[in-house]
């Protein structure tokens, strides 16, 4: 067991399995998972039943951004952290909106920093902001951002996702952090949540500036959109979906704007438990936010196209020799994504299984999210000096 991980069974019922002790399992139960065609999988995911120096801000002409001045998060503001709204541009000229969290009384020291994003279809006012603020309480500069085309970020049309552009969004956040006078650019890490766990791994594989990465309750969005849950989609079903999505492009071109799917995360009865869990987070006061695609919108119908054609996990072995930590709930329907990623990644790597936790528990359950272990991982990986 690595020295930075707590020994024994930590508080909150978290069970830890190190890379040596963890036994990879591929025969996961399929009970309660969605079955059927790739189109059904796309519907389930793209329309899931849905005193420091001033930081540098960059804007673009691609989208008129309006940042709310109010605290409109789904979590309480911490008295231990300073918060400010910032913007920066990615390599494609899209302006991204973000929340920057800084530990109070930093004494002018250059600090280690973290870029945080996710879940897929969420905004920075939800889970990623909670992670960022909590890690700032532990001494890190942390930035939580809205991906391109969503939330307060720029980009048209709205509510589009892209494996390439979203991977670039992560690196753009690293650009931003590395330009801040209070950040040590040689000590930057990344945290990805849910679908952004897979995107974070893809980004860190190519962006060698990042020194360590955590993927919490990760999805591989390219895999699930292409193959369905538990890889249940046949080649024939995949081809049929691609025909439908390709023809949708003609309709969108004729109309001059993209078609959107139905509202996300609405329940009709009889859904699998993980879909109920999504609803209970995104559609209730617990996690609802009006700017989140998963709470109050839907993706463009053609969003799955690029994910079906561009696998995200191809190069994750190239994260090494930088350390990787995967965190997943014991009872999460999505656990097999992390197991496959763990098998594909090279050392140094570790895998934490959180006892009794579901996929959505790791969005906001403070008694389940292992922040002590996450901070210890980054403390070691980024060689952060003690205060």
Regions found by a protein language model. Give the residues of each.
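Alpha/beta-hydrolase active-site loop
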Residues: 161-180
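Short beta-strand/loop motif that positions the catalytic acidic residue
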Residues: 326-328
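N-terminal secretory signal peptides and thylakoid transit peptides that target proteins
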Residues: 22-40
């Amino acid at each position: 067991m690595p020295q930075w991980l707590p020994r024994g069974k930590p508080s909150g019922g978290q069970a830890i399995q190190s890379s040596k002790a963890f036994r990879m399992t591929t025969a996961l139960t399929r009970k309660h998972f969605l079955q059927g065609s790739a189109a059904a999988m796309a519907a389930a995911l793209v329309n899931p039943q849905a005193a420091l120096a001033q930081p540098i801000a960059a804007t673009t002409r691609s989208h008129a951004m309006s940042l709310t001045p109010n605290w409109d998060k789904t979590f309480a503001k911490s008295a231990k952290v300073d918060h400010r709204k910032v913007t920066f541009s990615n390599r494609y000229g899209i302006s991204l909106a973000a929340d920057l969290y800084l530990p109070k009384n930093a004494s002018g020291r250059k600090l280690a920093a973290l870029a945080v994003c996710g879940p897929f279809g969420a905004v920075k006012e939800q889970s990623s902001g909670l992670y960022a603020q909590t890690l700032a309480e532990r001494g890190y500069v942390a930035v939580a951002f809205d991906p391109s085309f969503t939330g307060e970020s720029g980009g048209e049309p709205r509510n589009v996702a892209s494996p390439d552009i979203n991977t670039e969004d992560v690196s753009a956040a690293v650009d931003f952090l590395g330009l801040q006078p209070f950040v040590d650019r040689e000590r930057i890490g990344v945290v990805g949540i849910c679908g952004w766990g897979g995107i974070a791994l893809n980004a860190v594989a190519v962006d060698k500036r990042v020194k360590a990465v955590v993927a919490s309750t990760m999805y591989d969005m390219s895999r699930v959109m292409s193959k369905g849950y538990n890889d249940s989609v046949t080649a024939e079903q995949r081809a049929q979906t691609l025909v439908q999505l390709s023809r949708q492009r003609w309709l969108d071109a004729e109309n001059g704007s993209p078609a959107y799917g139905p509202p996300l995360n609405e329940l009709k009865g009889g859904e699998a438990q993980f879909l109920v869990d999504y609803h209970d987070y995104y559609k209730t006061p617990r996690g609802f936010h009006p700017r989140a695609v998963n709470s109050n919108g839907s993706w463009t119908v053609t969003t799955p196209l690029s994910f079906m054609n561009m696998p995200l996990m191809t190069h994750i072995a190239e994260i090494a020799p930088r350390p990787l930590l995967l965190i997943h709930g014991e009872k999460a329907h999505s656990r097999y994504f992390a197991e496959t990623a763990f098998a594909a990644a090279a050392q140094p790597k570790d895998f934490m299984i959180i006892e009794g936790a579901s996929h959505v528990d790791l969005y906001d359950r403070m008694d389940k999210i292992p922040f002590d272990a996450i901070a210890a991982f980054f403390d070691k990986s980024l060689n952060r000096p003690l205060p």
